[in-house]
Amino acid sequence: FSERKNFISIGNFLHEPNWQTVLQLKKLWKNIKNQLPEAEIHIYGAYASEKVFQLHNEKEGFIIKGRAESVETVFNTAKVLLAPIPFGAGIKGKLLESMQFGLPNVTSTVGAEAMHGNHDWNGFITDNETEFVEKAVLLYQDENLWQKSQENGYKIVENRFKKELFEPHFIHKIQEISENLESHRNQNFLGQILQHHTLQSTKYLSKWIEEKNKK
């Protein structure tokens, strides 16, 4: 805890929710910085365009870093990850990685959806801007809370994301389909449509080649 410093945010800028997350952080950062004058937030992400770098402000401690050469190094040296994700679907990789690397975070309900089940979150979940700022500051300063949040993250990974939890069922399913491939294909209506149109495209391409060769 004592060897870590600064906040981070990370995400590929080709993905719109990541850009909107950074815009939200820019909006919230001033209130965080007022309470933590020595702290900075480092924004990482590949494909950062000029509009992203325009948000860079060293005086405010809002630092656009661009692509991270080593995600492991970034996650192991930061103190808190901030992810006020406004929209999106599915498991958020940045939050799962924050758990794996022992980095507590503050995120939105969208960010945390479908991730922790009945386990306590590794930090805080809130959609309220004032509360987001309060929790970010609290998590940054309170060592006991920070360590408890770190432990929560490890438990979530252990109980919900370990490979061993899914591997046997996945392998069994693959074997089952392989042994009953024809039956599976007959029940896979969408797959049949895709297969049909794949063959049709090949059919008409071959006809086009035949006509071209006649000339």
Question: Which residues make up each language-model segment?
Answer:
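Conserved catalytic-core segment of nucleotide-activated headgroup transferases in glycan assembly
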Residues: F1-E72, N76
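Acidic donor-binding loop of glycosyltransferase active sites
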Residues: N76-G90, L103
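C-terminal amphipathic helix plus adjacent low-complexity
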Residues: L145-Q147, Y154-K215
